[in-house]
C-alpha cells in the first residue's frame, strides 16, 4: 500500500496523479529501501506457538491446540468434505488468533465463496489488523486469480518488514479450479480434467508460508475440499498432500452423527510438534492417540469431547489425561 500526496485531477484524467510518496506498507522510505528480499530470507520450522484456547471455551480450538498445534510460519491445510464445518472452524481460528495475537496482520481470503458467507465473516471478524479480501462465485476466474496474487504479494512485503502475517484461505481447491480455467493449455491433462500447469501458482501461494530466521513469518491455513463427487477436487488434494507441515482432517461421518467439531484426531497432526508443545502437552497428545487405537472413530471422538467438556481448560484436561493413564497402568 502506497501513501502519499495527490495533485488535483485534470479534466481529461480519471484519477489525480501521485506526485510524492510518503510511506509504503505503513513504513517510511528509508526502511523500505533497506528491506530484504522475501526469497533471500532463511525458512525454518515454526517454533513460536499460536495459542488458540480462549476464555470462550471453544472445544474445537482446544482440540486443535493439543492434537494439531499451529505455530507462526505454519503451512496448514484443513481437509474437509462438504458440510463438515470447515468455514466455521476457519472463523473460530480467526477469532482465536485475533484475541490471543492481536499484533499479527490477518488476511482472510475467500475465493469462489457465497456472498452471504462473505458478509458473515466480515461482520464476525473485525480489527485494526484484519483484512477480508474476497472474490465471490459470480466473478470471473481471472478475478479470483488477480485477487489471490495481490494478497500473497502484499503478505510477502509485510514479512520483508519483519511482521508476522497469517492468511486464512477458503479454499485452495477453488483457487486451483480458477487457475485451471485461465492458464494456457500445456497439452497434458491429469485425471478429472486438471491441467498440471494450473497447480503452479496455487503451490507458490501455499509454499510461501514459512517462518523466517531473520524475523517475520507467513502463516497460511487453507481449506481443501474432498469427497465432493468431483475427481478434480480429489486430484488437487492429492497434489497438495504432503506439501504442508500441519493437517487438520474433518470427517463427514462424525458431522452426520451431529458430533461437532467433526475432527478426525487420528488423521490430524503437525510436523515437529515437539517445537511447539510442552512435554506435558506432548505426552497428553500421545496418550490420546494411543487410547484411540482400536476403538471406533465415532466412540473415541465422543469420549474425548466429553472429557474436554468436563474440563475448563487444556491445563486441567492434560492433568486429567495424566491421571487416567496412571490409573490404567496400575
Predicted feature residues:
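P-loop NTP-binding catalytic core
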Residues: 7-78, 84
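Active-site scaffold segments
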Residues: 78-79, 91
Amino acid at each position: 500500500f502506497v501513501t502519499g500526496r495527490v495533485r488535483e485531477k485534470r479534466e481529461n484524467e480519471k484519477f489525480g496523479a501521485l506526485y510524492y510518496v510518503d510511506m509504503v506498507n505503513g513504513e517510511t522510505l528509508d526502511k523500505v529501501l533497506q528491506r530484504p528480499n522475501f526469497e533471500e530470507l532463511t525458512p525454518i520450522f515454526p517454533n513460536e506457538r499460536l495459542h488458540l484456547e480462549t476464555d470462550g471455551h471453544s472445544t474445537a480450538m482446544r482440540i486443535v491446540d493439543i492434537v494439531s498445534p499451529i505455530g507462526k510460519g505454519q503451512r496448514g491445510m484443513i481437509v474437509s468434505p462438504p458440510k463438515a464445518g470447515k468455514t466455521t472452524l476457519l472463523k473460530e481460528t480467526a477469532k482465536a488468533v485475533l484475541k490471543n495475537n492481536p499484533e499479527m496482520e490477518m488476511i482472510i481470503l475467500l475465493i469462489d465463496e457465497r456472498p452471504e458467507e462473505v458478509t458473515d465473516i466480515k461482520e464476525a471478524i473485525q480489527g485494526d489488523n484484519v483484512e477480508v479480501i474476497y472474490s465471490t462465485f459470480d466473478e470471473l476466474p481471472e478475478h479470483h486469480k488477480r485477487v489471490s496474487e495481490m494478497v500473497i504479494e502484499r503478505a510477502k512485503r509485510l514479512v520483508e518488514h519483519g511482521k508476522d502475517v497469517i492468511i486464512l484461505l477458503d479454499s485452495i481447491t477453488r483457487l486451483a479450479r480458477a487457475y485451471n480455467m485461465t492458464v494456457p493449455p500445456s497439452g497434458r491433462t491429469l485425471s478429472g480434467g486438471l491441467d498440471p500447469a494450473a497447480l503452479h501458482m496455487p503451490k507458490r501461494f501455499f509454499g510461501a508460508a514459512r517462518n523466517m530466521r531473520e524475523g517475520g513469518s507467513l502463516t497460511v491455513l487453507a481449506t481443501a475440499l474432498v469427497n465432493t463427487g468431483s475427481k478434480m477436487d480429489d486430484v488437487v488434494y492429492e497434489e497438495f498432500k504432503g506439501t504442508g507441515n500441519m493437517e487438520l482432517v474433518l470427517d463427514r461421518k462424525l458431522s452426520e452423527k451431529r458430533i461437532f467439531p467433526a475432527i478426525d484426531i487420528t488423521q490430524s497432526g503437525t510436523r515437529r510438534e515437539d517445537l511447539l508443545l510442552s512435554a506435558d502437552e506432548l505426552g497428553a497428545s500421545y496418550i490420546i492417540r494411543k487410547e484411540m487405537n482400536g476403538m471406533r472413530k465415532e466412540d473415541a471422538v465422543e469420549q474425548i469431547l466429553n472429557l474436554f467438556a468436563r474440563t475448563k481448560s487444556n491445563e486441567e484436561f492434560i492433568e486429567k489425561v495424566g491421571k487416567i493413564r496412571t490409573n490404567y497402568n496400575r
